Amino acid sequence: MLARFFFVLPSAALALASPPGHKLCPSQSGMPTKPTPVLPSNGGGHSELPEPSEDVSLKHIALGFGIQNYTCADTAASPTPVGALAVLYDVTHLYPGQGHSSLTQDEWASLPGDILDTLKVPLNLNEKGTGASLVKPFPKKRDLKIRSLSKKIPYLGHHYFNAAGVPTFDLDKARQLLVAKKIGDIKAPASSPAGPEGTGAVNWLFLGDAGGSHGISYAYRVLTAGGASHGCKAKGADSTSYTAMYWFYN
């Protein structure tokens, strides 16, 4: 179990039994080319997140890998979410049908859970497992190596909560920033990966611009794995490892 970590900087397996069909992008010749990535449907009996409006376009699909933070007032209380911390990796090219390195639909849907179950959280964790370093939580910026892929997944940025407690996505590799607010959320499908500690998957989210963003206006958190709290077994702070797919639009 990871102890809760709340970092302040100065300046958030799919039930894809039937994956959504691809949208084909017509080429200038009128012939279909690579499919346009389509947000996954929840398929778990819950209402869906709103679809992206027609006046925005997809900028990145990122894998977020880190921790969700909670606090408990006492053992009888419900855990209160108090932030998150994650490294973001650009997986747009891995979406099915995008190119020679693309994954199959099944591989894509299982990627967050597979990574969470097999790799170490890419943060500077304290030696005794009490969360991430308060001084330098993020390690050196580097791409993510996965045994099943011939090439590393490119680093894209960081996810954290700023000094005002606002969820922030700093895509510094692309020089883009989303200072976010929650517009909507739904429960993750029951079949979603529960994570290595079996806590369950955090909700899917739809996020918008809270002011101060540039290059990104909206984000979706989908295909979540792990990240739900351990419950209030004691008073204090707690953290749970998680992965998710973040779809960024502008």
Q: Where are these predicted regions, by residue range?
A:
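Fungal secretory targeting signals
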Residues: 1-21
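Primary mode marks residue(s) on the alpha4-beta5-alpha5 output face of response regulator receiver
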Residues: 20-67, 76-250
